[in-house]
Amino acid sequence: MNTQILILAISAFLCVRADKICLGHHAVSNGTKVDTLTEKGIEVVNATETVEQKNIPKICSKGKQTIDLGQCGLLGTTIGPPQCDQFLEFSANLIIERREGDDICYPGKFDNEETLRQILRKSGGIKKENMGFTYTGVRTNGETSACRRSRSSFYAEMKWLLSNTDNGVFPQMTKSYKNTKREPALIIWGIHHSGSTAEQTRLYGSGNKLVTVWSSKYQRSFAPNPGPRPQINGQSGRIDFYWLMLDPNDTVTFSFNGAFIAPDRASFLRGKSLGIQSDAQLDNNCEGECYHIGGTIISNLPFQNINSRAIGKCPRYVKQKSLMLATGMKNVPENSTHKQLTHHMRKKRGLFGAIAGFIENGWEGLIDGWYGYRHQNAQGEGTAADYKSTQSAINQITGKLNRLIEKTNQQFELIDNEFNEIEKQIGNVINWTRDSIIEVWSYNAEFLVAVENQHTIDLTDSEMNKLYEKVRRQLRENAEEDGNGCFEIFHQCDNDCMASIRNNTYDHKKYRKEAIQNRIQIDAVKLSSGYKDIILWFSFGASCFLFLAIAMVLAFICIKNGNMRCTICI
C-alpha cells in the first residue's frame, strides 16, 4: 500500500514538472589569464595584450622628410667640417645620425654638447645668416691638413684668425652681432689650444691671449692652454667649441687678441623634428612615429618592452613582457562536447548548469563572452542571445585600450650617455632618473591594467545580475529559482512565452492561475515526502529504544536469579 502511494506521488510530481529557462554567458575551452587588484591568474573569455614586443628592424620613413647624415655628425652641420658640406643647411622632420658620423675634423670637442644635440634633433633643420664680420690686420684663411677637401682647408662656417705674419702681433679686436630675426640664433665660436707655446706665438704673437664673449644673458672669458697632447688626425692642438642661443634683438660681442675661431654665419632652427641615432636601414615603404636604435616600433598598444630609449610617439617602456587587459567576463571553461555536456548537466547540475559558463558554443552575430538564455519546454530546447545586455557591456568595455594609451603615450626625446668627464655626474643622474622612471611606470602599468581588469570583471558580473533580476521580476510567483541560474516555471510556457520573457513583455497575470495550481501540486508532493521522512526516522528511533529496554530487563532478571554474575576487578 505504501509503495502504491509513493508511486502515485512521484507520478504526480512528474506530471507537473515545470518548464525551465536559464541565464548565462558564453564560455570557451581555453580562456586567457589576467591579474586584478585582488587576485592573480583569473581566467577570462577575452583579453588583449597591452605590451608591444614586435620590432621593425628598419627606419620607417614613408611620409617623412628624412635626412640621413651618413658620415656627418649632427653638431657638424653648424660648423661645417668637410664631411658635412652638403648638410650646412637643410630641412627635415626626421634626422638620422649614423655611428660613423663625426662632428669635427680638427681634434677637439663641444662644450655642453648633449644639450646642443637635443636642440638640433628637435630643430626641423637649420638655415644660416651671415654675421657680417670683417677683419683688418689679421689673416682669415687659417687651414689644416686635418680638414681636407681637395687640399688643406678648415670648417666651412668658421674663420681661423691668424697674425698677418708668423710671430707677428695680433691686434685686440671687438666684433658684435645683433639678432634681428624673430627666432633665437645659434652662435658658435671656438678657442684654439696650440700644441705648444712656441706654436701659439707663431700663430698669434707673444703674450697672454684672452677671448671674452658676452650678451644680455651670457658672460664668459676663455684663455687658451697651449701644450703637447696626443696627436689626432696628425694634430697635437685642440679646438674647443662653445655656443649660446641669442634671443631676438639681443647682441653678442666678442673681444679677443688671438686663439679665436670666429663664427662666419649664425644658425636658425627651422621647426620641429625627431632625431635618432641608428644604423638601421631606411625604408620608404612603411610609416612610423616611434624610433629607437634598432629600428621602428609600430604599435597601438600603451606599453612596449623593446627599448627603453625609444623616441617619438611611443608606447611607455615597461619591464614586463606581457600585461593582459581583460575585454570579456570571467571564464568557466567546459571540457566536453555539446552532447556530453548536456548529459552531464542533467545528471549533475540539472539541464543547464550554473549562471556562468553553461553555453558551450557562440551564436552567429554574438561576440564571445556575453549573455544569453537557454530554455526547455514541451516544444524542445532553445538558445538565444540577449543583445541589449551584451551591447551594454561592450559599450562600457570598448575604449579601455584607448584610455590606457591616452594615460601613457607622450612624445619622448633621446638623451644619450656620451658625456664628457665634467658632465659624468649629470649623466649618472640622468641614467638614475631614467631607471627610476622605468621602475615607476612598470608599477603604474601593472596597477592600471589590474584596475581595468577588476572593473571589467565586476562590470560583466553586474550585467549578468541585471539580466537575472529582470527575469525574476517578470516571473514573480509563477516560477521558482533553483539556485543554479535557472527558473522552474509552474505553467506551460511555449516558445512564444519564452520569447516574451527574453523580450521583457511577459504577462505574469495571464499564467497566474495555472501556475498557482501546479505549485500547490508540487508543494503537496514535497510535503508528503517530508512527513514520510519524519515517520521513518521516528520509527527507527522507537525500535532502537525498545530493543535496548528489552535487553536491559532480561539482564536484570538473569542477575537477580543468579544466572548472570558481574565481577569488577581492580
Curated annotation (Swiss-Prot):
Name any GO cellular component annotation: host cell plasma membrane
Give the UniProt record's GO annotations in the biological process aspect.
clathrin-dependent endocytosis of virus by host cell; fusion of virus membrane with host endosome membrane; fusion of virus membrane with host plasma membrane; viral budding from plasma membrane; virion attachment to host cell
Keywords linked to the UniProt accession: Clathrin- and caveolin-independent endocytosis of virus by host, Clathrin-mediated endocytosis of virus by host, Disulfide bond, Fusion of virus membrane with host endosomal membrane, Fusion of virus membrane with host membrane, Glycoprotein, Hemagglutinin, Host cell membrane, Host membrane, Host-virus interaction, Lipoprotein, Membrane, Palmitate, Signal, Transmembrane, Transmembrane helix, Viral attachment to host cell, Viral envelope protein, Viral penetration into host cytoplasm, Virion, Virus endocytosis by host, Virus entry into host cell
Q: Lipidation annotated as S-palmitoyl cysteine: which positions? A: 566, 569
Topology with regard to the membrane? Single-pass type I membrane protein
User: Quaternary structure?
Assistant: Homotrimer of disulfide-linked HA1-HA2.
Q: Which organism is it from?
A: Influenza A virus (strain A/Equine/Sao Paulo/1/1976 H7N7)
Glycosylated residues: list them: 30, 46, 249, 335, 431, 503
Question: Can you summarize the PTM annotation of this record?
Answer: Palmitoylated.
Q: What does this protein do?
A: Binds to sialic acid-containing receptors on the cell surface, bringing about the attachment of the virus particle to the cell. This attachment induces virion internalization of about two third of the virus particles through clathrin-dependent endocytosis and about one third through a clathrin- and caveolin-independent pathway. Plays a major role in the determination of host range restriction and virulence. Class I viral fusion protein. Binds to sialic acid-containing receptors on the cell surface, bringing about the attachment of the virus particle to the cell. This attachment induces virion internalization either through clathrin-dependent endocytosis or through clathrin- and caveolin-independent pathway. Plays a major role in the determination of host range restriction and virulence. Class I viral fusion protein. Responsible for penetration of the virus into the cell cytoplasm by mediating the fusion of the membrane of the endocytosed virus particle with the endosomal membrane.
On the tree of life, the source organism's domain of life is Viruses
- Name of this chain's protein: Hemagglutinin
HAMAP family registered for this protein in UniProt = INFV_HEMA
Any one GO molecular function term: host cell surface receptor binding
Residue ranges of the TM segments = 534-554
Locations listed in the record: Virion membrane; Host apical cell membrane
Q: Which Pfam families match?
A: Hemagglutinin
Q: Which residues does this entry assign to the site Cleavage?
A: 349-350
- What family does the database annotate? Belongs to the influenza viruses hemagglutinin family.
Which cysteines bridge via disulfide bonds? Answer: 22-486, 60-286, 72-84, 105-147, 290-314, 493-497
Q: Other notes on this protein?
A: Major glycoprotein, comprises over 80% of the envelope proteins present in virus particle. The extent of infection into host organism is determined by HA. Influenza viruses bud from the apical surface of polarized epithelial cells (e.g. bronchial epithelial cells) into lumen of lungs and are therefore usually pneumotropic. The reason is that HA is cleaved by tryptase clara which is restricted to lungs. However, HAs of H5 and H7 pantropic avian viruses subtypes can be cleaved by furin and subtilisin-type enzymes, allowing the virus to grow in other organs than lungs.
Q: Which residues lie on this side of the membrane: Extracellular?
A: 19-533
